[in-house]
């Protein structure tokens, strides 16, 4: 279930029950809002985007996508984007080629599905400040216009033999930040790139850097 919190008082004021989900068979991950509705991707052993009415705090609809949608963002055209990881070989929930989905927020329907190869592991879908360019990790770092008809052939940044583990874009200037877990044991590193892919800076942080948040 999803907890509702009063940010001024730091108090839990209620919760939203998610149908067909237990602690062992699902997780709610990221959220975006369109009008009075909040949308949330359900990841672990799930394949759904749920739609929540903020006036009633109830799940009112759901949309099936591929296995395990990992991210959720809303672009400048009011289109939601999610990417699935496809599960893993031997998973009791299934294993399939992952996909990137474009979903119309108004109709809550899938408009476009971009399929990856079986064994790919796309993640960390992000948008720039104008919300017209999409970024994600799939071994390399990829960038695509939100109106594109197909996934680009060449990556924004090529794989460099390390572990890209987190990704964000500065909403003010379009600079791309990449978290490198290196080997999951030593201090990780952050790389800062220009919107054109030029390395501007790099610095060490804590072990396994995996997420960013802009003030």
Predicted feature residues:
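Repeated scaffold domains used in trafficking and secretory/extracellular systems
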Residues: 23-32, 67-75, 119-129, 161-169, ...
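Asp-box/WD-like beta-propeller blade repeats and closely related beta-sheet repeat scaffolds
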Residues: 1-34
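Short loop/turn segments that connect beta-strands within beta-propeller blades
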Residues: 6-10, 52-58, 104-108, 145-150, ...
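Conserved beta-strand positions in repeat-built beta-propeller and related beta-rich domains
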Residues: 39-45, 80-95, 127-129, 133-140, ...
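A short beta-strand motif characteristic of beta-propeller blades
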Residues: 11-22, 58-64, 109-117, 150-159, ...
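C-terminal hydrophobic structural anchor segments
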Residues: 150-181
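Loop-centered beta-sheet repeat module
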Residues: 34-85
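Structural motif
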Residues: 1-4, 46-50, 89-101, 140-145, ...
């Amino acid at each position: 279930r999803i907890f509702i919190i009063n940010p001024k008082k730091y108090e839990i004021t209620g919760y939203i029950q998610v149908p067909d989900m237990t602690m062992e068979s699902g997780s709610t991950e990221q959220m975006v809002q369109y009008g009075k509705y909040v949308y949330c991707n359900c990841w672990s052993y799930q394949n759904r985007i749920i739609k929540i009415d903020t006036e009633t705090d109830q799940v009112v609809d759901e949309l099936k996508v591929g296995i395990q949608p990992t991210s959720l963002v809303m672009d400048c055209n009011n289109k939601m984007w999610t990417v699935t990881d496809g599960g893993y070989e031997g998973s009791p929930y299934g294993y399939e080629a992952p996909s990137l989905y474009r979903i119309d927020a108004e109709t809550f329907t899938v408009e476009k599905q971009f399929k990856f190869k079986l064994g790919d592991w796309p993640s960390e879908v992000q948008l720039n400040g104008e919300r017209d360019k999409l970024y994600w990790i799939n071994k390399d770092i990829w960038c695509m216009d939100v109106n594109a008809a197909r996934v680009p052939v060449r990556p924004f940044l090529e794989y460099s033999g390390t572990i890209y583990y987190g990704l964000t874009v500065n909403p003010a200037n379009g600079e791309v930040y990449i978290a490198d877990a290196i080997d999951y044991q030593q201090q990780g590193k952050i790389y800062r790139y220009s919107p054109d892919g030029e390395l501007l800076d790099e610095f060490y942080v804590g072990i396994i850097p995996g997420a960013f948040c802009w003030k």
